Amino acid sequence: CGVNKNGTITSFAWTYDSAKKTFLNIHQRISNDEGKTWSQPKDLNISDQPSHPALLKDGKVVLAWVDRFKNQSIKVIVSDNLNAHFDEISEVTIFNQKKIKQNSKELGGLLADMNIWSFGLPYADVLQSGKVLVFYYAGNDKKMDLHWIRLKFE
Protein backbone atom coordinates (compact mmCIF):
# COMPACT_ATOMS: atom_id res chain seq x y z
CA CYS A 1 0.00 0.00 0.00
CA GLY A 2 0.95 3.61 -0.49
CA VAL A 3 -0.60 6.85 0.76
CA ASN A 4 -0.37 10.03 -1.33
CA LYS A 5 -0.17 13.60 -0.01
CA ASN A 6 -4.00 13.88 -0.06
CA GLY A 7 -4.42 10.77 2.11
CA THR A 8 -5.63 8.52 -0.70
CA ILE A 9 -4.53 4.92 -0.17
CA THR A 10 -3.63 2.63 -3.05
CA SER A 11 -3.05 -1.10 -2.91
CA PHE A 12 -1.45 -3.37 -5.50
CA ALA A 13 -2.07 -7.13 -5.22
CA TRP A 14 -0.89 -10.29 -6.94
CA THR A 15 -3.04 -13.38 -6.50
CA TYR A 16 -3.22 -17.02 -7.46
CA ASP A 17 -6.50 -18.40 -8.83
CA SER A 18 -6.55 -21.90 -7.35
CA ALA A 19 -9.60 -22.93 -9.41
CA LYS A 20 -7.91 -22.03 -12.70
CA LYS A 21 -4.43 -22.91 -11.36
CA THR A 22 -2.92 -19.71 -12.66
CA PHE A 23 -1.49 -16.45 -11.36
CA LEU A 24 -3.60 -13.37 -12.06
CA ASN A 25 -2.37 -9.97 -13.14
CA ILE A 26 -1.60 -7.26 -10.60
CA HIS A 27 -4.77 -5.47 -9.51
CA GLN A 28 -4.99 -1.98 -8.01
CA ARG A 29 -7.57 -0.76 -5.50
CA ILE A 30 -8.00 2.78 -4.15
CA SER A 31 -9.54 4.12 -0.94
CA ASN A 32 -10.43 7.78 -0.47
CA ASP A 33 -11.74 7.36 3.09
CA GLU A 34 -8.81 6.03 5.12
CA GLY A 35 -9.45 2.43 4.09
CA LYS A 36 -13.13 2.22 5.07
CA THR A 37 -14.19 1.49 1.49
CA TRP A 38 -12.24 0.47 -1.58
CA SER A 39 -12.69 0.70 -5.34
CA GLN A 40 -13.24 -2.43 -7.37
CA PRO A 41 -9.97 -4.14 -8.36
CA LYS A 42 -8.51 -2.67 -11.57
CA ASP A 43 -6.51 -5.14 -13.71
CA LEU A 44 -3.22 -3.46 -14.66
CA ASN A 45 -2.32 -6.00 -17.38
CA ILE A 46 0.97 -6.57 -15.57
CA SER A 47 1.74 -10.05 -14.30
CA ASP A 48 3.58 -11.21 -11.20
CA GLN A 49 4.55 -9.51 -7.91
CA PRO A 50 4.13 -5.75 -7.29
CA SER A 51 6.23 -3.60 -5.01
CA HIS A 52 5.33 -0.88 -2.57
CA PRO A 53 4.56 2.08 -4.88
CA ALA A 54 6.62 5.26 -4.92
CA LEU A 55 4.18 8.19 -4.84
CA LEU A 56 5.85 11.34 -6.14
CA LYS A 57 4.90 14.86 -5.04
CA ASP A 58 3.60 15.68 -8.54
CA GLY A 59 1.15 12.77 -8.30
CA LYS A 60 3.07 10.27 -10.44
CA VAL A 61 3.07 6.65 -9.28
CA VAL A 62 6.12 4.45 -9.82
CA LEU A 63 5.49 0.72 -9.47
CA ALA A 64 8.22 -1.89 -9.55
CA TRP A 65 7.34 -5.54 -10.07
CA VAL A 66 8.89 -8.94 -10.56
CA ASP A 67 8.29 -10.43 -14.00
CA ARG A 68 9.24 -13.88 -12.74
CA PHE A 69 7.50 -16.19 -15.19
CA LYS A 70 7.88 -14.44 -18.56
CA ASN A 71 11.18 -12.55 -18.69
CA GLN A 72 12.68 -13.28 -15.25
CA SER A 73 13.34 -9.63 -14.55
CA ILE A 74 12.43 -6.71 -12.32
CA LYS A 75 10.79 -3.74 -14.01
CA VAL A 76 9.35 -0.33 -13.18
CA ILE A 77 6.46 1.49 -14.79
CA VAL A 78 4.93 4.95 -14.27
CA SER A 79 1.44 6.43 -14.27
CA ASP A 80 0.58 10.14 -14.12
CA ASN A 81 -1.58 9.67 -10.99
CA LEU A 82 -3.35 7.03 -8.90
CA ASN A 83 -6.28 6.80 -11.32
CA ALA A 84 -4.27 6.90 -14.55
CA HIS A 85 -3.25 4.01 -16.76
CA PHE A 86 0.30 2.66 -16.41
CA ASP A 87 1.71 3.30 -19.88
CA GLU A 88 3.93 0.54 -21.32
CA ILE A 89 6.11 3.20 -22.95
CA SER A 90 7.35 4.14 -19.47
CA GLU A 91 8.37 0.55 -18.64
CA VAL A 92 12.05 0.06 -17.77
CA THR A 93 13.83 -3.19 -16.90
CA ILE A 94 16.15 -2.64 -13.93
CA PHE A 95 17.31 -6.25 -13.45
CA ASN A 96 17.54 -9.34 -15.67
CA GLN A 97 18.07 -12.77 -14.15
CA LYS A 98 19.83 -15.49 -16.07
CA LYS A 99 17.13 -17.47 -17.85
CA ILE A 100 16.10 -20.46 -15.76
CA LYS A 101 14.05 -23.38 -17.04
CA GLN A 102 10.95 -23.82 -14.95
CA ASN A 103 10.20 -27.43 -14.15
CA SER A 104 6.52 -26.99 -13.35
CA LYS A 105 3.52 -24.78 -14.01
CA GLU A 106 1.62 -26.05 -10.96
CA LEU A 107 1.75 -23.88 -7.82
CA GLY A 108 3.40 -26.56 -5.67
CA GLY A 109 6.05 -27.18 -8.30
CA LEU A 110 6.65 -23.46 -8.78
CA LEU A 111 7.15 -22.97 -5.06
CA ALA A 112 9.51 -25.95 -4.90
CA ASP A 113 11.54 -24.76 -7.91
CA MET A 114 13.73 -22.40 -5.91
CA ASN A 115 15.74 -21.27 -8.95
CA ILE A 116 12.94 -18.92 -9.99
CA TRP A 117 12.91 -17.39 -6.50
CA SER A 118 16.55 -16.22 -6.61
CA PHE A 119 15.46 -12.58 -7.13
CA GLY A 120 12.54 -10.44 -6.11
CA LEU A 121 10.73 -8.41 -3.46
CA PRO A 122 11.29 -4.99 -5.01
CA TYR A 123 10.40 -2.00 -2.86
CA ALA A 124 10.06 1.50 -4.32
CA ASP A 125 9.95 4.77 -2.41
CA VAL A 126 10.65 8.45 -2.93
CA LEU A 127 13.89 9.93 -1.59
CA GLN A 128 14.08 13.46 -0.17
CA SER A 129 15.72 14.53 -3.46
CA GLY A 130 12.61 13.46 -5.37
CA LYS A 131 14.40 10.51 -6.97
CA VAL A 132 12.93 7.04 -6.60
CA LEU A 133 14.90 4.31 -4.85
CA VAL A 134 14.09 0.72 -5.78
CA PHE A 135 15.80 -2.08 -3.92
CA TYR A 136 15.43 -5.84 -4.27
CA TYR A 137 17.30 -9.09 -3.66
CA ALA A 138 19.06 -11.09 -6.35
CA GLY A 139 21.66 -13.81 -6.60
CA ASN A 140 22.00 -17.53 -7.08
CA ASP A 141 21.95 -20.73 -5.04
CA LYS A 142 25.30 -19.82 -3.45
CA LYS A 143 24.94 -16.10 -2.68
CA MET A 144 22.21 -13.48 -2.39
CA ASP A 145 22.73 -9.72 -2.31
CA LEU A 146 20.64 -6.59 -1.95
CA HIS A 147 20.63 -4.45 -5.09
CA TRP A 148 19.34 -0.93 -5.56
CA ILE A 149 18.88 1.71 -8.19
CA ARG A 150 17.98 5.40 -8.03
CA LEU A 151 15.71 6.71 -10.77
CA LYS A 152 14.80 10.26 -11.72
CA PHE A 153 11.47 10.99 -13.40
CA GLU A 154 10.75 14.28 -15.15
Cite the ranges covered by each PLM segment.
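Asp-box/BNR beta-propeller blade signature and adjacent active/binding-site loops
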Residues: 1-154
